[in-house]
């Protein structure tokens, strides 16, 4: 049986809030959640998202996470191709980088 992996929407942070930077000691490109202060070329890691809008349409694209509001379970994302900034509700996220998200 070939199923795609599923996660709870509460684990969304592990997929959306990654950083990418160049390590000054080794010169290698690193990926993680907290970058050191001495890191160079620090930028957010892009990810593919598919989510449901408030009007019921499915929207998708490659974007980066700009900010998170944990009390409202919302995050601001900027689409890479268009530069459009949108607010996405965590419970309406269907898929991130091939991993399906479910609500309880």
Identify the residue ranges that each predicted region occupies.
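Acidic/proline-rich low-complexity IDRs
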Residues: 11, 70, 91-93
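Structured surface patches comprising rigid loops and adjacent beta-strands/short helices at the edges
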Residues: 66, 87-101
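HINT superfamily self-processing domains
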Residues: 2, 15, 68, 73-79, ...
């Amino acid at each position: 049986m070939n199923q795609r992996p599923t996660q709870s929407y509460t684990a969304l942070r592990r997929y959306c809030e990654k950083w990418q930077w160049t390590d000054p000691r080794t010169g290698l490109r690193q990926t993680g959640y907290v970058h050191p202060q001495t890191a160079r070329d620090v930028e957010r890691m892009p990810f593919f998202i598919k989510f449901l809008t408030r009007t019921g349409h499915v929207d998708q694209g490659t974007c980066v996470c700009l900010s998170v509001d944990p009390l409202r379970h919302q995050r601001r994302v900027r689409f890479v191709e268009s530069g459009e900034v949108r607010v996405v509700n965590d419970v309406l996220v269907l898929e991130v980088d091939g991993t399906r998200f479910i609500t309880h």
